[in-house]
Amino acid sequence: MSEKMSPLSFRQLLTRALAEYEREGSVFGVRAKYVSDGRSLPLFGGRVEMPFGPAAGPNTQLSQNILAGYYAGARFFELKTVQKMDGAELAACIARPCIKADDEGYNCEWSTELTVPQALTEYVHAYIAIKILSKRWELGDPDGFIFNMSVGYDLAGIQTPKMNAFIDGMMDAEHLPAFTRAIEEAQAILPDMAEYIRAIDPHICRSVTISTLHGCPPQEIESIASYLIREKHLHTLVKCNPTILGYDFARKRLDAAGYDYIAFDDHHFKEDLQYEDAVPMFHRLMALAKKEGVSFGVKLSNTFPVDVKAGELPSSEMYMSGKALYLLTMEMAARIASDFEGKLRISYSGGADALHLTELYRAGIWPITVATTILKPGGYDRFLQMARRMGKCSYKVRARVDARAVRALSEAAAGDPLLQKAPKPLPRRTIGRPVPLLDCFTAPCREGCPIHQDVPEYLHLMEKGRAPEALALIARRNPLPFITGTICAHNCMSKCTRHFYDTPVHIREVKLQAAKKGYRALMSAPPEKQSLTSAKVAVVGGGPAGLAAAYYLGLAGAEVTVYEKEKQLGGVVRQVIPEFRIPSVSIDKDVRLVKAAGARFVLGKAAPTYRTLQKKYDYILLAAGARKSALLSIGGRELNAVAFLKAQKAGETPVLGEHVCVIGGGNTAMDAARAALRVEGVRDVTIVYRRTKKYMPADPEEVELAEKEGARFLPLLSPLSAESGRLTCQVMELGAPDAAGRRSPVATDKTVSLPCDTLISALGEKTDLEFLAEYGITPDASGRPPFRSDNVFVLGDLRRGPATVVEAMADALAARDAIVGSPLKYPIPEGAAMSQCSAIERKGVLTVKDPEPRRCLGCQVLCENCVTACPNRANAAIRIPGKAMPQILHLDYACNECGNCAAFCPYDSAPYKDKFTLFATMEDMQESRNSGFFIADREKELLHVRLEEKEFDCCLKEDTPMSRELETFLSTVLHHYEYLLV
């Protein structure tokens, strides 16, 4: 494929918009229709119904992008920057992919990739289309939006003939061929609007934003602004760089918010516009603008240049945006608002989104433009929420920016949890397999769950208040809802698409609510047993793996006996995990549910020998846990964390002394630290870890609880020896980042000594190889036993080493399927699946206050992340007769290989490379390796198709080498989505 975009003609732009709106109720894939309430604000000699819109960038490069934004509620458009270097020359300088917006944003692209004349044509087309469609569809006042040019990067370039023609053409397009031709075509397409179309005002733009390169001298910036104010009489904004804050402040604020890994030095801070030069310059430009009868202000802010250190993008430098930039831009706004006493207009573009928009506006900062938020799932649809929130604001214009309010916003930003970097490295969001050509919508939460819980369905049942049915559905796959509702590692939450919106759905919390509210009903009518197998099964171990196996196999009809050497069931959860983390009553409830499946339990004694079990049972399931304790053995008084916790829970707490050191960084270490703090005589507990706190494997909430309860964290220390009440540790330091950006600890020659009466080692447990040998199990070279050896299965921690409860359950479920000979099947309750209408309503809506089930996006019903995140509308959703799930078609002609869609696909794939692709020409197809098709003859339905590595010509009216599903897909595109064909 090629990164070269092919702009739509005006006829294609307008006819597609009209056809799609009539058939689908959407415009270029945007369903979120905004209709103005009739109010507007005066700005730059015009009026805007909404004081926000897309920033100069990928969302204002093509005409369809701009029209899509307008439809969803945007009314102020900062058009993509135009400069003398353009077209193929500029495109060749941009590394691909060039956008990464999965958390804070990064890009390595800059001004328009079109030629300057092409850019002018795109903006003319978008302007005329909005004028026409706003009236035809009654979306708002056709004069209620504003286009704002963005030009750069030096005065000489701006004064070149092609740039001068661009600026003049935007100011008055009456005699431009692009304008007159579009007006004529529009009249031909919509003859009933001919009179209105002829009268469209050709004055497209009255304002400009100046963008300059880093290192541009203040004299150059002032000369550009003076020229545009004095010679062009344009309302002018100067875009400022965050470097104006100074290196020390920027580094300190970003570090405090968790962005300490973002790499930059001070050279841009030294070379860029300095604050002491900016203030007098802005005063002079304010005076000049007043004299010329136009307005002047600043645009805060430009993106922030940082170094590529972890292969984020294929360049050496990239530009940061989004929530991290908000932290810097708000401080810029606070300083400028204060020093200019609110008299200098501030236009904002630095990580704003729907949750911060109205705060900015009420403080007198507007117009507001956004980029990163609309590059995430929901895309342009996010504008509708912004419009609805703005609709609650007064449109009484402030005379000045409220400096106190802006200062408060800057200070609040520093502590805003939505702007902070996650305390742990972001988990892998994808599900570990490639995206299929068809039927790709999936629930990443379910895919991320080791037992593939029906997460969206039980969330939806809980949303409807149907807790008993929600728990009954949970219990089909999960016999331990109280345990997993309390201490599950919740891999599901790590995959949640809401990570790209605000915060993930708290799925574990909802599961626990379902368990509490639905338990009585479930126990009165537990899951029915089936007769799928008559096997006799012995389970050795009554922890989570053994309990789950007894439940799954018992419900399948097996005759199951569980042998547990302890007097109570529950394994490590019962014997080791402290009561303050999970109460025994919760474990008891799960055990009662498991017992309802009919297994027999033998407690308080060891299981019979392997030979005895072999004679009596068809299958043996080993679920005895990781039985070998790990110790440092470096001297001093040392306890194993598991042994310590087990003793304390049994009421046999040892004397620890005053000073306790816990070695390790997992949940067990946190439990041990919290438990030690509760022991009489203990004055302090120190958690020693050889990496940084950020890389501790413990759950963030467990780390936070340990810290709140008084545990002290000492990272980057590696224990060497313990004696005479002291622990000696080697000081570590972080080495250079690896390819993934992770910095491993490296030993130094420094040591520290800590007071330590007792050392508690939380280093994980090991598999008991001798125990496995008794059952004829031989581990592989890495020491890991096989899942199955003849009729013996190895489950949970015994197989994996220290693992999670839900991973142990996954092993049990896999053993059940192997013994039964078929996967677990069951009906989904009626009404458990979210409707597509409900899923559509939730797309693009940021919320952290709604009830958790309501925040579910229904990804398995309607994903479309790649559709909504694409700024160019290069991924289209195709509805096929007889299929509930829309299919994704990639449009090669609209794609510039920015790569943005790849960040949000739940699969290990890049939709712009891996989804079935429509090519406009055979030449385009030959430049690509995508599976896809070119229409050789539309009337005869002749296609040239590439399917994986095979290419062939075919006719859809005859038999083809393709599947019937793919034939139907292509036929639907030809006959019902002909407006996509160019």
Feature-to-residue mapping (PLM):
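Glycine/Thr-rich beta-alpha phosphate-binding loop at enzyme active sites
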Residues: 22-37, 246-342, 377-395, 636
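Catalytic cores of alpha/beta
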Residues: 64-67, 352-368
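Glycine-rich phosphate-binding active-site loops on the catalytic face of alpha/beta enzymes
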Residues: 75-85, 242, 359-386
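Rossmann-like dinucleotide/flavin-binding elements
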Residues: 540-561, 602-612, 628-632, 644-700, ...
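Ferredoxin-type iron-sulfur electron-transfer modules and their immediate structural context
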Residues: 317, 374, 381, 385-536, ...
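Beta1-alpha1 glycine-rich phosphate/pyrophosphate-binding loop at the start
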Residues: 453-463, 471, 500, 504-508, ...
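Feature captures the FAD/FMN-dependent oxidoreductase FAD-binding
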Residues: 531, 536-538, 588-634, 720-728, ...
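N-terminal capping/small domains of soluble enzymes
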Residues: 1-231
